């Protein structure tokens, strides 16, 4: 509200008020509508919902914005400002609408109604005050507070307390809760007649008076003229109460006549007069016998409408208004409606197109009522001769109209007389041909018997078919059960086989893991042995070094001994080379065997998996480790070291046992004197 300045108040309604305002930034005029009773549908205000659906249409008012004030208790709608409306124009005594203006406004009104109905929306409150007219003569529909959506002949219950009373159709006045967009077309017809006559078409003080005016003009509806009217709650309540009142009056008059006959035996003339008067009263009371008494129970959601019978006019059911007691087609009903309108408004004789369109929109039966698309295609909107013609209201015109009405009534009387003659001829023919009726009855009975026989045969056939279908269904069920059992058995066997293969595979993996652990243990043992051998070799080299030192100090080896030692060393080297070659060959063989084992131990599919324990190659591995020890043994080189003369040097053996060095006794004897000499 801070962006708008309120200039003046335009109007006040049941659910809020409308103000004229101006936008502070754009300086454009707007209409601000304050709504206190906010009706919502699908979590959104009704008027906002449907105005957004009908946005930017030519004959619908444009909604610019909306917001809440006073703690969301008041809804404010910002719409385009249009100062004039149709009610202000018609209520001005100095303003007289031409026939061209009436046609223009009616066409624009039908365009707006069509835009609503095409989008699945019923306005439910069409009246002149809700038809805004711009300075350019554009008519726009406004006030969608009572609008609702509908499906094609929706079966949901709706409120019957909608549409302003003067423009409310008869089905809503009779309490119907199932209706469609045809209720808007009745309102358009009332507005058209109001513009033509410059006065309200039906201006009842309440719902009862409104029904009275409608039925006075168009006659009392029956099941023949309006199928389904007797099921409306207001219809039953209306006519049943009237019949009860007439029966009570008849009973009272009969009792009164009996008392007069018993008490006034001497006054025969008076009694005869009283009886004649009572008979006349009874004849007058019989005018309600033409009203249909059949009724259906009304829906529980629609409240009954009461109080019609007590306030309807006395000539409500007179013969003058009972024009629908016979069976008529849609064209006959339109002709009767046109006649009734001409009787009340004689100047419509000179406006046949207007009369035709109005009678099609003001049909009592809503299913026979014209829709907005059909109304826009009416010939009245295609002609342009009456654009500037003023609606006639002169006395000469009324005389001409009365003459036309008298001539039409004479024609109707002649037609009625002709129909009576035809009925009499038909009755005579029926009396002359009693035998034909009997034959027809017999044929009818035979046809009924044949139909019964055919029904029995059809029933027997259906029973046989059902029995056959049951047997077929049972067989199919049995086959399905067998298939299911077979599938279960196959699945169980497959699962068992798969489990067995899985267990075998797990066992094989466990065995492989155990073998790998054993191999690791063997490798660790071999490593330990290799370490021990290396230690022994180191000790051996230390002893040899000590021994050579002793030899260098106390002896000079001979050349022959040196040559022998060299030969021995060469032989040892040759032996070591041969051993290395053998070890390489054994390693190659072991690698080939390991590759073969890996190929054999690869995982195969469960269906063709055959477990074969691997071949243990413990001996070959042991040999391989033993050869590996020989490869890593260091070879002593004694080319430039002195050798002892009497004894050969001890050589390292390729066994796993540790070697020990022995010193010859000659060396010990030589060492001792030297020590003693040095001591001395």
Swiss-Prot record:
Binding sites annotated in the UniProt record for ATP: 10-18, 33
Record field: compositional bias (Polar residues): 287-297
Catalytic activity, EC: 2.7.11.22
GO biological process terms on file: regulation of cell cycle phase transition
Catalytic activity: L-seryl-[protein] + ATP = O-phospho-L-seryl-[protein] + ADP + H(+); L-threonyl-[protein] + ATP = O-phospho-L-threonyl-[protein] + ADP + H(+)
Gene Ontology MF term list: ATP binding; cyclin-dependent protein serine/threonine kinase activity; protein serine kinase activity
Entry GO terms, CC: cytoplasm; nucleus
Descriptive protein name: Putative cyclin-dependent serine/threonine-protein kinase DDB_G0272797/DDB_G0274007
Species this protein is from: Dictyostelium discoideum
